[in-house]
Amino acid sequence: MKEPPSLLWGLDPVFLSHARLYIKDILELKESNQVPGIFFYKDHPIKQVDILGTVVCVREKDAFYSYGDVHRSTSGANDLDGLVQELHRQESSKAKMEIGDVIRVRGYIKVFRMQREVVASIFYKVDDPTLDMQIMRMLELPYLYKHAYDKPFILPEDMTNQSQEQPNQAVLQRSGLISLLSEKIMNFVKENTIYNFYLPELESMPSLLSEATNPHYITESDSNVSSSSREIRSLFKEAIHILLKRGIVYQKGQNKDVYYVTDHDKELHKLTLNMIKQDCSRQGHAEKGCHFLHILNCVQQDFGSCINEAILQRVINALEQNSDIVSTMEKYYTAF
């Protein structure tokens, strides 16, 4: 099966998500001929996966230790030393995996020494004595395969001409440019730790501006229009719109000229974490934790309706990666 062009991969939602595939299928994925580290399940590009399974083998490597000293002349130093030791014990108990443990792993696929492996960005033991999560995953996977993974990736109608014989090259080039520009903007705000920005600020950045005026993606008939400031503004707006839909940036309040970067919004992260901590201390949420939609409703009440599911999911993922919260069940979260 022929691979779709790499510029169009961003239009496939499977590529942007953590694919929940059977381990057998992950081992049999075909690596892309265009981009190393990207794999294909049928015609869907896969770069990251979400696995729930049982540990059947443990291979331990040499441990490394870092030794330090603390001056114990004060009670404060003793208290600090005790807290550090307790934290180390808690982390060791959560990180140590034994045969028979049920674990959840999220990460990207990699080939190392001719073997397929998943490099974990987050992993943790799952407390599932009644097998609820495993049964839920067993019921969920056939549905995902039927309605997403096994279905062919079809381009939107506006990217194919009426005869369906040849793709509209001009539309494909513009769409590819917008998708690439959105990725460049996302990387730019991440690498420079930008908390918020105005659209004209991005348009003045040479690295982003050169991408928007890349002649490789501009046809001869449109070269004059595409180089104009109006067309450049349109490209940036559509690229930002993609980031808005993915929850990478958002707008709040009456000022719609400012874009806030979700991953760098400490106030939003702190509010979400405190809300989960407070609600998990209550009797109704103490056992399972808080459901995602309940968290969303509470955050919207305090922060505003500008927070949608995509934005909150990024915040939840960041809190999980920092080990501030863990998922107790599918879409349920609790804080330490």
Swiss-Prot record:
Coiled coil: none
Species of provenance: Aquarana catesbeiana
Protein name: CST complex subunit STN1
A molecular-function term among this protein's GO annotations: single-stranded telomeric DNA binding
Keywords on record: Chromosome, DNA-binding, Nucleus, Telomere
GO CC, alphabetical: chromosome, telomeric region; CST complex; nucleus
Annotated region described as Winged helix-turn-helix (wHTH) 2, given as residue ranges: 264-336
GO biological process assignments: telomere capping; telomere maintenance; telomere maintenance via telomere lengthening
Record-annotated DNA-binding residue ranges: 49-126
Region of interest: Winged helix-turn-helix (wHTH) 1: 162-263
Upper classification of the organism: Eukaryota, Metazoa, Chordata, Craniata, Vertebrata
InterPro entries attached to this UniProt entry: CST_STN1_C, CST_Stn1_wHTH1_sf, NA-bd_OB-fold, RFA2-like, Stn1, WH-like_DNA-bd_sf, WH_DNA-bd_sf
Primary location class: nucleus
Entry's localization field: Nucleus; Chromosome, Telomere
Subunit structure: Component of the CST complex.
Protein purpose: Component of the CST complex proposed to act as a specialized replication factor promoting DNA replication under conditions of replication stress or natural replication barriers such as the telomere duplex. The CST complex binds single-stranded DNA with high affinity in a sequence-independent manner, while isolated subunits bind DNA with low affinity by themselves. Initially the CST complex has been proposed to protect telomeres from DNA degradation. However, the CST complex has been shown to be involved in several aspects of telomere replication.
Similarity-based family: Belongs to the CTC1 family.
